[in-house]
């Protein structure tokens, strides 16, 4: 045999249990026996063994027996038939001298049955002469069964080996797949980590820039608020100062107007006291001449003022503008009043702001005419 027998498989044990002989008699529990009965049984067993060795009788399988062996007893006792042994008791004993166990069990049962009958002698007929051939057939059948069982065992072992190989192959393939999947997952995780790192770096830079931009915006907003407040304050200050300037100019114009009115009244009184009447034509000519002279003087003064402006401070330029506006107001206020006075009475002369002694000249001219 190439391989050692590893034992029955589960299927074989199940099959043996199913094919168990249904006619196997149940063993009776041995009852307590006396000393004499034990001695008798021993004697019967020895006698049966001697007879079995001499005759070479062996037990056969129940299906191989044509008829059960008949045993005869003396005339003193009625005959009794020995029970047929099942196939399980036909196996040879592995220890001893090659005697079958069926022969030993049969005398024991006979001894148990005959122990109740007393001291009667038992005579067993010798078996048939074909027992040796039948024994050989049984051995051949047992050998064939043994070989069949070994072949089945070998087939089962080969199947188990193939199954183990298939399982090992499947496990190796699964392990390779799992390793490949783990490698893919690791690579994907690395790529995701790299993307996360890039995004986090970009986000950090953008956040720093946003923080700096928010600080700059807050500073610019503060400056804008301050500038807006200053602009509003300056605008209010300008409006207030312009109102003050307008009020002052109006007040100056009213003062000049009142002064001119007083002068006109004074001149009228003087003319009435002297009984002097002025011609309207001469007065108109003198007024036109004075206007032309005044315009020429103003035009001659303008380039001088333009040349002097870059060297003048801001306060002087403001005072010059204020003086110009006052002059314009004076001219606007005086010119219509003088026209009215000339229309009403020809004795009122034209007063020029550039000629402080104009009143005396006018009076002397009026007296000369």
UniProtKB/Swiss-Prot annotation:
InterPro entries: GORAB (IPR007033). The keyword Acetylation does not apply. Residues 46-61, 82-93, 342-361 have a biased composition (Polar residues). Residues 1-128, 334-369 are annotated as: Disordered. It comes from the Eukaryota. Residues 145-297 form a coiled coil. It is found in: Cytoplasm; Golgi apparatus. One of its GO terms (biological process) is hair follicle morphogenesis. Residues 188-369 are annotated as: Necessary for interaction with RCHY1. One of its GO terms (cellular component) is nucleoplasm. Residues 11-27, 106-120 have a biased composition (Basic and acidic residues). Its main location: cytoplasm. Keywords: Coiled coil, Cytoplasm, Dwarfism, Golgi apparatus, Osteoporosis. PANTHER family: RAB6-INTERACTING GOLGIN, RAB6-INTERACTING PROTEIN GORAB. It is linked to Geroderma osteodysplasticum: A rare autosomal recessive disorder characterized by lax, wrinkled skin, joint laxity and a typical face with a prematurely aged appearance. Skeletal signs include severe osteoporosis leading to frequent fractures, malar and mandibular hypoplasia and a variable degree of growth retardation. Interacts with SCYL1. Interacts with RCHY1 and RAB6A/RAB6. Belongs to the GORAB family. This is RAB6-interacting golgin. The lineage of its organism: Eukaryota, Metazoa, Chordata, Craniata, Vertebrata. The gene is GORAB.
């Amino acid at each position: 045999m190439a391989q050692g027998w590893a034992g029955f498989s589960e299927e074989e044990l199940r099959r043996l249990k199913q094919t168990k002989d249904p006619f196997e008699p149940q063993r009776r529990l041995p009852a307590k026996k006396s000393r004499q009965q034990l001695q008798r049984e021993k004697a019967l067993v020895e006698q049966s063994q001697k007879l079995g060795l001499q005759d070479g009788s062996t037990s056969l399988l129940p299906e191989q027996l044509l008829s059960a062996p008949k045993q005869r007893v003396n005339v003193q006792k009625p005959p009794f038939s020995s029970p047929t042994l099942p196939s399980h008791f036909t196996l040879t004993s592995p220890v001893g001298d090659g005697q079958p166990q069926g022969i030993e069990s049969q005398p024991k049962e006979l001894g148990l049955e005959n122990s109740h009958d007393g001291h009667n002698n038992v005579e067993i007929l010798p078996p048939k002469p074909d027992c040796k051939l039948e024994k050989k057939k049984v051995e051949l059948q047992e050998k064939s069964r043994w070989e069949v069982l070994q072949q089945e065992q070998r087939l089962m072992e080969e199947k188990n080996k193939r199954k183990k190989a298939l399982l090992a192959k499947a496990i190796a393939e699964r392990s390779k797949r799992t390793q490949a999947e783990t490698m893919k997952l690791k690579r994907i995780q690395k790529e995701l980590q790299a993307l996360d790192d890039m995004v986090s770096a970009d986000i950090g830079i953008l956040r720093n820039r946003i923080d700096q931009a928010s600080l700059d915006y807050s500073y610019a907003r503060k400056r804008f608020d301050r500038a807006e407040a200053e602009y509003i304050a300056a605008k209010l200050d300008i409006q207030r100062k312009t109102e003050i300037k307008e009020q002052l100019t109006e007040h100056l114009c009213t003062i000049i107007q009142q002064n001119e009115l007083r002068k006109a009244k004074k001149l009228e009184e003087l003319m009435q006291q002297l009984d002097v009447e002025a011609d309207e034509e001469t007065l108109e000519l003198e007024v036109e001449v004075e206007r032309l002279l005044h315009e020429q003087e103003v035009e001659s003064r303008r380039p001088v003022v333009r040349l002097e402006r870059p060297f003048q401070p801001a306060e002087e330029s403001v005072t010059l503008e204020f003086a110009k506006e006052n002059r314009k107001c004076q001219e606007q206020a005086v010119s219509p009043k003088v026209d009215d006075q000339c229309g009403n009475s020809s004795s009122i002369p034209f007063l020029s702001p550039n000629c402080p002694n104009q009143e005396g000249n006018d009076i002397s001219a009026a007296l000369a005419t």
